[in-house]
């Protein structure tokens, strides 16, 4: 008696292949989703770390402000830039933070002049900070994807736009000498606005207390 050979029919094989193909696609989509989530999380983490580093530098600059009596103000704001005199181990240094348009929409740029030890060099560096265009040596794009920023000074028991508090950038006096200085405010508030898709959507507000 001949034994009957048992096996899969062609239809069963095709059905099995279709099922395996569907499972493979689902598995790939799952892996792809995990990879995309990981990449997005990593990018977000890097952006957050960079933001924290930049804000820490901003705070450090403000904490190091030194009233030198050699320039109009230890801290000045003209709307486009915030300039300050900060102390370093090598001497005094002029630092300027500015908002500059770029391909991402806008960037927060930090310029740092050389540390100097003479009044003349400090005044020259201050005057140079009034003419920055954004690409000078010492300039660094700290954050990108921005749409704008606002700066407020705390004086007379309240916050006000830095240009309306009396801490405007002073004009130079006769002979190119800086005009009398203006005392810094008690605190500084910066509001950074980020564009959609930048990874840091919305506004970030940071308040920094000055002085002892």
Tell where the protein language model's regions lie, with residue ranges.
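Aliphatic-rich helix starts adjacent to a transmembrane/signal segment
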Residues: 2-64
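Short, glycine/small-hydrophobic-rich surface segments
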Residues: 62-86
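Residues embedded in well-ordered secondary-structure elements
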Residues: 73, 86, 135, 179-181
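Solvent-exposed loop and beta-edge segments used for protein-protein assembly and interaction
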Residues: 76-78, 89-91, 182-184, 200
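A short, compositionally biased
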Residues: 77, 102-106, 183-190
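Type IV pilin-like appendage domain
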Residues: 79-164
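Short linear sequence signals and composition-biased patches located at protein termini or domain-edge surfaces
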Residues: 143-212
């Amino acid at each position: 008696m001949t034994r009957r050979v048992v096996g899969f029919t062609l239809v069963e094989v095709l059905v099995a292949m279709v099922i395996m193909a569907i499972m493979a696609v689902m598995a790939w989509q799952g892996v792809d989703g995990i990879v995309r989530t990981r990449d997005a999380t990593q990018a977000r983490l890097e952006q957050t770390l960079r933001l924290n580093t930049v804000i820490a530098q901003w705070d450090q600059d403000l904490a190091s402000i030194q009233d030198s009596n050699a320039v109009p103000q230890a801290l000045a704001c003209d709307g486009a830039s915030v300039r300050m005199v900060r102390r370093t181990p090598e001497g005094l240094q002029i630092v300027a933070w500015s908002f500059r348009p770029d391909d991402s929409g806008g960037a927060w740029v930090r310029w740092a002049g050389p540390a100097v030890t003479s009044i003349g060099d400090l005044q020259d560096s201050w005057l140079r900070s009034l003419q920055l265009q954004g690409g000078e040596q010492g300039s660094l794009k700290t954050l990108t994807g921005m749409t704008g920023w606002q700066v407020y000074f705390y004086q007379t028991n309240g916050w006000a736009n830095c240009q309306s508090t009396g801490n405007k950038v002073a004009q130079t006096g006769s002979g190119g000498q800086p005009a009398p200085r203006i005392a810094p405010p008690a605190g500084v508030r910066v509001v950074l606005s980020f564009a959609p898709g930048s990874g840091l959507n919305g506004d970030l507000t940071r308040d920094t207390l000055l002085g002892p």
